[in-house]
Amino acid sequence: LSRARAAGGAFNYGSTGPGSMPHIATVALARSAGVAMTHIPFRGNAEAIVSLMRGDTSIFADQPGTLRANNLHPVAIFAESRVAEFPQTPTLREQGHDLVYSIWSGIYAPAGVAPEFIARVDAACAEALRVPAVVEGFSRLATPIVYRNAAEFAAFNRAELEKFRGVIAAAGIRPGD
């Protein structure tokens, strides 16, 4: 961040495209730190990593597995806590920025689906996430399993939506940026 501050806006960061998690998370970091950075969007992490390695961009946010596979060194983690793959790397919270941006997914259903069906899918998801092969697969991807039942996931989803809306609106991110 000190390099970005010293560059006065001439500090380039890569992302996997406008509105992507790396884009939004880095915008949030720049705003939290009060620094100007220039967004360089790419069509995926392969292009962004090449740009980083060439020195065209100075930072890029991605998942631990991608960093490890490309021999990249993280300087901060956008997670609640440190990750096992890089235990020496502090979270942004530890560095004074209350920023948690993680890749997550869920299962959605159209409005009006019978509650009994939702309950069956919810139970099946909870059970699937306890299967040893599934746990091992997520572990190999350095992806923690965080199960939320339907009500918890709905509340989490609303909170994430508001968090993203705030960053997107404050930064003026529009489709195609």
PLM regions and their residue ranges:
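C-terminal lobe and pocket-closing loops
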Residues: 65-130, 162
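Hinge/capping helix and adjacent helix->loop/strand transition within the periplasmic-binding protein
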Residues: 1-47, 102-137
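A local structural motif
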Residues: 9-12, 31-51, 56-57, 142, ...
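An extracytoplasmic/periplasmic, membrane-proximal ligand-sensing/linker region
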Residues: 32-35, 115-177
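Short beta-strand and adjacent tight-turn residues that come in two discontinuous sequence segments
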Residues: 42, 61-62, 77, 148
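Short gly/ser/thr-rich secondary-structure transition/capping motifs
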Residues: 55-60, 90-92
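Phosphate-coordinating loops and pocket residues in cytosolic domains that bind phosphorylated ligands
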Residues: 2, 54, 94, 139-140, ...
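Short helices/loops that flank or line small-molecule/ion binding pockets
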Residues: 27-28, 32, 46-58, 65-71, ...
